[in-house]
Each structure stands twice: as structure tokens, then as C-alpha cells.
Amino acid sequence: YIKRFQETRLNKKDFDLLVNCIKDNNNFAMVTAFDNESYNLIKKQPIDIIKIASCSFGDWPLLDSAAQLDLPIIASTAGANLETIDNVISFLSNRDKSFAIMHCVAQYPTPDKNMNLSQIDFLKKRYSDVRVGFSTHEDPGSTDMIKIAIAKGADIFEKHIALPTEEYPINKYSVNPVQFEDWLKAASFAQDVCGVGDKRILDNKDEQKSLKSLQRGVFFKDNFDTGHVVNSE
């Protein structure tokens, strides 16, 4: 076990309090388990979603424990080779699981040059029947990556948020509440400007008015009877 996890470990009472608070605020409770034993605790909680961390993406015993629960799964793919991703998707699909995968870079924080957001395009193309999201660890003050990810079609997002304490400062990849609000505003802006992408949209009246004022037309200087034939000359 990692020392940091042991130092911040929650007991059953703590978990009950945390999950109840999540539910009381009308949010979904999502949990990441790093060992099989933790799934015994998950079974006792009203959890909505199972998260598979990138470090556990190819951990077959852990994936098997997750798949045995009747819960949707979101799995991060950082560092996984193509064969592993193919196998995990096959594993979950063959068990009729509701699941999504996340483009993710396991570098904390992730420099802009290493974000590789075009991997979202790759994953969406290769696994066209699977929802693809974005789990991000960039500089907490950045709001650019979420906008690009939305423009590329990601529709599930994971962001680390933290509150500093006297004993534990915020790490270098987690946002504080103010930064999180800015991040959400950036996401909302991106969704608004991206608009609709699954059908042709022609309902902009101002656009139609502008085009009409610029388009060529045919006009008659004399009156003609109904049925009069007009030719190109």
C-alpha cells in the first residue's frame, strides 16, 4: 500500500458520511478501488459508478471484481498499449457492461506538450461504439484543455478538486473550488460554441437574412401574366 493512501484512509463511518453527503446534494457517487478487498465495502454503499484508474487498467482480477457489480464503469487508459485497451474493451463488452473509456496522461501535472488530445479522436474512431471521455491532470489554472477535449467529442470528464488543510496542501494537479468554477465555465462555453454535430443546422435567422442580402436574384421590370414563359435571354 502507498504510504499517502494509508495516511488518508477512511473508515466505514467516514465512507458512510461522505457518500451520504454526495447523495444529499443530488450528485452521483463514483469510487475507485485499488484492491479487490475494497469491493466488499463498495457493495455496502449506494455507489452509482465504478472508476478504474489508469494504473489498474490492465489489472484483470480487479476488473473482474468491478464487472461482477451491476454498476457502470469508467476506465482511464493512460499508459495502456493498444492490445490492452482492445482486451479490456472486449472483456467488458462480452459481459454486457455499460462502460466508457477516458483519454488520460498519468503525469502529475501534465505539461501542455504531453496532453496528446488527438488521442480522443483515435479512441473514438477505433472504438466507435464506446463513449470516450477525458481525465485531466494539467496545470490547475488552465482552462484550455477542457475546451479542446469537448471540441474533439469527449463527453465525460474527470477533474481532481481539493481543499487545503494544515497537514495536507493541495497537490500540483488538483484545482481549488474557485479554479473548478472557472473550469466548469470553460466547459460550458465550449459546449455552447461547438453546438450540434450530429445533424445539419439551418435555423439561424440572422444568417439566412445576411445570405439573402448577398445572393443573386432575378427581378422583372415589367408585369407578366400568369403562365408567361421566361427563358435565359
Each language-model region and where it sits:
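Catalytic cores and adjacent flexible loops of soluble metabolic enzymes
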Residues: Y1-E233
